[in-house]
């Protein structure tokens, strides 16, 4: 196991609020024949008062057919991943995104220009539930691809401090998507845990593939905003209260 993979595994294994664990288990139980892993991420990781907040999960499934059958939801999830749904458990509210194991691996890596998954999983997350050891290993391996992909896409600048590289990289990803957050949000991601990003810097840089190409951000912005619109339009049908969700996201 590489030093980066070990860092990711250790971080994903950190404990969470028992209510988050219970929610993840209940979410996995909704898809008993498909669920492989449930990851918890986002700003709520740093919160102890969860009431009134919207928690964020990724549900990783073996396949979309195993999750939904052969209907339109499986086709929509494959065509424009992920599908996003609301979830409520024991008074807590969440939204969860569904990806297959194959898509989760692919979307965390440099083979996709879209930033949405690898930008999120370059940040702290928790692997709250997994079906078995194999599912856990696959989730760790997928998440381990995210940070090198982020830094490689941003490209290095001579003399730039590691934390500034992270800040610049996140700023680039925030410019790609339709987001309601303030522009300063990209810097606050790093500033909320600078020691974490310092610790990840050298292993993540070492894991950047040889010959990795930086740049292409003008194209990413055009494609990213179009994809964001397509995902939001799809969410109007998959997400209960879809119009309210659209307004909140925009």
State each model region's role.
Residues 1-30, 34, 39, 45-51, ...:
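Catalytic core of pol beta-like nucleotidyltransferases
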Residues 58-60:
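Short hydrophobic/aromatic beta-strand micro-patches
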């Amino acid at each position: 196991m590489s030093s980066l993979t070990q860092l990711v595994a250790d971080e994903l294994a950190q404990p969470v609020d028992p209510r988050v664990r219970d929610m993840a288990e209940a979410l996995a139980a909704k898809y008993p024949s498909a669920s492989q892993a449930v990851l918890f991420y986002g700003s709520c990781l740093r919160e102890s008062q969860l009431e009134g907040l919207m928690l964020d999960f990724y549900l990783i499934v073996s396949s979309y057919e195993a999750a939904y059958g052969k209907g339109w939801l499986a086709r929509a999830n494959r065509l424009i991943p992920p599908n996003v749904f609301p979830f409520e458990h024991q008074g807590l509210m969440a939204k969860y995104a569904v990806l297959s194991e194959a898509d989760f691996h692919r979307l965390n890596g440099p083979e996709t220009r879209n930033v949405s998954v690898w930008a999120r999983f370059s940040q702290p997350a928790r692997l709250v539930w997994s079906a078995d050891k194999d599912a856990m290993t696959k989730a760790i391996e997928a998440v381990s691809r995210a940070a090198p992909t982020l830094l490689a896409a941003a490209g290095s600048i001579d003399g730039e401090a590691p934390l500034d590289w992270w800040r610049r990289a996140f700023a680039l990803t925030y410019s790609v998507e339709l987001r309601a957050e303030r522009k300063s949000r990209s810097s606050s991601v790093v500033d909320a845990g600078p020691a974490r990003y310092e610790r990840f810097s050298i292993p993540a840089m070492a894991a950047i593939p040889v010959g990795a190409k930086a740049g292409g951000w003008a194209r990413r912005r055009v494609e990213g905003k179009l994809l964001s619109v397509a995902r939001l339009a799809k969410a109007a049908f998959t997400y209960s209260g879809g119009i309210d969700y659209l307004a909140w996201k925009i």
